[in-house]
Structure formats: C-alpha cells, structure tokens
Regions:
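Residue-identity detector for threonine
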Residues: 4, 12, 17, 59, ...
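Conserved binding-pocket/active-site segment within a compact domain
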Residues: 31-89
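Alpha-helical oligomerization segments
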Residues: 67, 71-140
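Extended, non-transmembrane interaction/recognition domains
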Residues: 1-39
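Proteins with a high burden of low-complexity, intrinsically disordered sequence enriched in S/T/G/P/A and R
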Residues: 2-11, 59, 97-98, 109
Length: 140
C-alpha cells in the first residue's frame, strides 16, 4: 500500500490518499484534513473511535487487536509528548495487509450478520481519527 500526505499551502489543508499497490492505481481512501486541527479534540476523537472498535470486536468475539488498542490508549493518555501521541495513533492503525481489520473483522462481521453500515461506521471513524491525529501533529 502507498500512503501520500500532502499539504497544499494555498488552501491550508492536508490531502491524504491511501492506495493499494497494483497495476491499477485506485484510491481506496481520500481525506481532506484541516491544516490546523485542535490536537486535543483529535486525540479525544481517536480514543472514542478506538472504544467503538473495541466494542465491535467484543460483539463479534474477536480479540486480535486488543493489545494494539490497549497500547494506543496508554500512549494517547500521555499527551505531553507528541511522539507518544503519534505512536498511539500508529498502534491503533490496524489496517492493510493480511490479518488486518479489513480482512479479519470484516469477514467475521459478515459471518455474524453484523449490519454492513455498523462495520463501515466504526471503520471510517477509526481511520479518520487516526489521520486527523497525524495531520494535527504535522501541523503542531
């Protein structure tokens, strides 16, 4: 996968694109972030998104990301150090690759008849919150 984070100074936004490496370059996710987000709000939103992801995992009986989410929470509680905040966001990033959120949790949700919108809502909230924290740190 390829991540591109680009700041366009004229309109004060970050443009984040996530692409899969293949013959066809197809953007899987595209987000525009404010170049001056409130980092404390971003951290709060990420903590909430992690809690929702943990709740979904508990609902489906999957605990493969439990340590990742616990480590993310631990690091996000030390907001005096931006490196801890960044590492917390990266610990919460359970996307891409075999055995990732996109593979495991998506498949189990489908098997357990969890509504697609519920999985999508939790996934988008977590992914967006991670990106917002990263953009917030880059703008700090």
């Amino acid at each position: 996968s390829i991540w591109t984070i680009k700041r366009v100074w004229q309109d004060t936004h970050w443009y984040v694109t996530y692409r899969e490496i293949s013959g066809v370059k197809k953007a899987l996710f595209y987000k525009v972030c404010s170049s001056s987000p409130d980092i404390k709000q971003c951290i709060y939103d990420l903590k909430n998104a992690i809690q929702k992801a943990q709740k979904l995992c508990d609902t489906i009986g999957y605990h493969g990301f439990e340590e990742d989410f616990q480590e993310a929470h631990r690091l996000l509680n030390d907001t005096d150090r931006l490196d801890n905040v960044l590492n917390g966001a990266l610990s919460a990033c359970v996307f891409a690759g075999m055995g990732s959120w996109n593979d495991e949790v998506a498949a189990i949700c489908e098997d357990k008849n969890i509504p697609q919108h519920q999985y999508t809502e939790v996934t988008n909230a977590l992914f967006s919150a991670i990106l917002n924290v990263v953009c917030g740190i880059c703008s700090y």
